[in-house]
Amino acid sequence: MDMGLREMCVGEKRTVIIPPHLGYGEAGVDGEVPGSAVLVFDIELLELVAGLPEGYMFIWNGEVSPNLFEEIDKDGNGEVLLEEFSEYIHAQVASGKGKLAPGFDAELIVKNMFTNQDRNGDGKVTAEEFKLKDQEAKQDEL
């Protein structure tokens, strides 16, 4: 598929044919794709969305607040639950202050971000656990 989409322009329509050896092979997928199937895709490129740097699923567009944890912790109890975290990240994306990786499940990205911050796995993030990616890199250098 990658080869078939190379150098495609916005508004362009293209038929991509994938032979069995580049698709599902002789075996196919039981009950879904017959063996030795030739895959044919009619594609129209409607929009080209820039991705994120390698290794990132979320980026900030601009400066990050120095009081980020406090902003996420809406109820001020010193702990951020997944619901608070998710609402905050989605609000940042909606306002253009943040960007999630296009083409991926947004809820899954946010859940993974939260899980990465919840270092002790107790279902909540404290200020001590909370670190941005660049802060983690500095700590690793020590």
From Swiss-Prot:
<feature type="binding site">
    <location>
        <position position="118"/>
    </location>
    <ligand>
        <name>Ca(2+)</name>
    </ligand>
</feature>
<dbReference type="InterPro" id="IPR011992">
    <property type="entry name" value="EF-hand-dom_pair"/>
</dbReference>
<dbReference type="InterPro" id="IPR018247">
    <property type="entry name" value="EF_Hand_1_Ca_BS"/>
</dbReference>
<feature type="domain" description="PPIase FKBP-type">
    <location>
        <begin position="1"/>
        <end position="49"/>
    </location>
</feature>
<dbReference type="InterPro" id="IPR002048">
    <property type="entry name" value="EF_hand_dom"/>
</dbReference>
<feature type="domain" description="EF-hand 2">
    <location>
        <begin position="105"/>
        <end position="140"/>
    </location>
</feature>
<keyword id="KW-0106">Calcium</keyword>
<feature type="binding site">
    <location>
        <position position="122"/>
    </location>
    <ligand>
        <name>Ca(2+)</name>
    </ligand>
</feature>
<dbReference type="GO" id="GO:0003755">
    <property type="term" value="F:peptidyl-prolyl cis-trans isomerase activity"/>
</dbReference>
<feature type="binding site">
    <location>
        <position position="129"/>
    </location>
    <ligand>
        <name>Ca(2+)</name>
    </ligand>
</feature>
<feature type="binding site">
    <location>
        <position position="120"/>
    </location>
    <ligand>
        <name>Ca(2+)</name>
    </ligand>
</feature>
<feature type="binding site">
    <location>
        <position position="124"/>
    </location>
    <ligand>
        <name>Ca(2+)</name>
    </ligand>
</feature>
<dbReference type="InterPro" id="IPR046357">
    <property type="entry name" value="PPIase_dom_sf"/>
</dbReference>
<dbReference type="Pfam" id="PF00254">
    <property type="entry name" value="FKBP_C"/>
</dbReference>
<keyword id="KW-0479">Metal-binding</keyword>
<dbReference type="GO" id="GO:0005783">
    <property type="term" value="C:endoplasmic reticulum"/>
</dbReference>
<dbReference type="InterPro" id="IPR051989">
    <property type="entry name" value="FKBP-like_isomerase"/>
</dbReference>
<feature type="domain" description="EF-hand 1">
    <location>
        <begin position="60"/>
        <end position="95"/>
    </location>
</feature>
<dbReference type="InterPro" id="IPR001179">
    <property type="entry name" value="PPIase_FKBP_dom"/>
</dbReference>
<protein>
    <recommendedName>
        <fullName>Putative FK506-binding protein 9-like protein</fullName>
    </recommendedName>
</protein>
<dbReference type="GO" id="GO:0005509">
    <property type="term" value="F:calcium ion binding"/>
</dbReference>
<keyword id="KW-0677">Repeat</keyword>
<dbReference type="Pfam" id="PF13202">
    <property type="entry name" value="EF-hand_5"/>
</dbReference>
